[in-house]
Amino acid sequence: MIKREDRRQLRLVRHKRLRKKIFGTPERPRLAVFRSEKHMYAQIIDDTKGITLVAASTVEKAMKEKLQKTWNITAAKEVGKLIAERALAKGIKEVVFDRGGFKYHGRVKALADAAREAGLKF
């Protein structure tokens, strides 16, 4: 069985390999997703300036009040909707999706699908 730290290292290797191909620009910033055991995080990043334009996560007080559990697919969908709403409010319509070395499956896929349904294009 693969130990937790080894799984983390393998994910970081995958993420590094992925980041060689994906780069966020001001016209089309990068939607970066991070999945921990208890929370989901999403940021829209302009890599040319190195700044976060929009962020959303299950750690926010409003999200915690809205959700019973912060680690399931329902929570990931809510984060996806929220990040899309905030991005559209700032005038960001297109992004490049960065899965962060995670499989495009489960919570990561749910977040991406919810963001697409809310109006983000990628």
From Swiss-Prot:
Subunit annotation: Part of the 50S ribosomal subunit; part of the 5S rRNA/L5/L18/L25 subcomplex. Contacts the 5S and 23S rRNAs.
Record-level Gene Ontology MF annotations = 5S rRNA binding; structural constituent of ribosome
Task: Give a short account of what the protein does.
Answer: This is one of the proteins that bind and probably mediate the attachment of the 5S RNA into the large ribosomal subunit, where it forms part of the central protuberance.
Stated name of the protein? Large ribosomal subunit protein uL18
Quote the cellular component terms of the Gene Ontology held in the record. Answer: cytosolic large ribosomal subunit
Has UniProt tagged this entry with the keyword RNA-binding? yes
Q: Does the keyword Ribosomal protein apply?
A: yes
